[in-house]
């Protein structure tokens, strides 16, 4: 069983990718709370560990070249965020469905080729994994994306 912080990392990456793909190529403000859920600051006003980890995931995606942003709003959001070329192509790319197990894909051979292409796209698989709620499915898809 994976450590919970790693499972949260994969879920955050998947949610960030899904949200940025929906707005591509527009730049948006990406709020940590929209990805990780509500924050519960401590008595000193410091963000909870989960919130901080999500913000760090956003920064990590930028440092590794998957997203671009112009500035931060404290540790609460990134401003003017968009997918980079690397991030966009990773999400548009077709994944080998044989590599992934545990993700429900409607890969009917009788469907038109264009629909089959959609079902094999990385972003479709990210959305399906998030929809399933399965940590294992999310981990598989994100690991495969980050290896490309």
Give the label of every model feature segment:
Residues 104-148:
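Short, cationic, amphipathic peptide segments
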Residues 20-24, 61, 90-94:
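Generic structural signal for hydrophobic core residues of well-folded globular domains
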Residues 2-45, 52:
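Short amphipathic alpha-helical interface segments
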Residues 59-75:
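A short, conserved structural fragment
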Residues 4, 46-49, 71-78:
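Short acidic, glycine/proline-enriched loop segments that cap or flank alpha-helices
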Residues 79-116:
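Short, amphipathic alpha-helical interaction segments positioned at domain boundaries
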């Amino acid at each position: 069983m994976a450590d919970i912080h790693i499972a949260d990392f994969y879920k955050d990456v998947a949610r960030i990718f899904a949200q940025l793909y929906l707005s591509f190529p527009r730049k948006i403000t990406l709020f940590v709370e929209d990805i990780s859920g509500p924050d519960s600051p401590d008595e000193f006003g410091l963000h909870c560990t989960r919130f901080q980890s999500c913000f760090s995931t956003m920064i990590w995606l930028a440092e590794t070249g998957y997203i671009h942003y112009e500035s931060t709003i404290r540790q609460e959001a990134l401003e003017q965020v968009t997918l980079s070329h690397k991030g966009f192509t990773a999400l548009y790319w077709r994944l080998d469905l044989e590599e992934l197990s545990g993700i429900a894909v409607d890969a009917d051979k009788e469907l038109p080729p264009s629909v089959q292409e959609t079902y094999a796209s990385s972003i479709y698989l990210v959305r399906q994994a998030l929809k399933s709620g399965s940590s294992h499915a999310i981990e598989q898809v994100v690991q495969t994306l980050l290896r490309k």
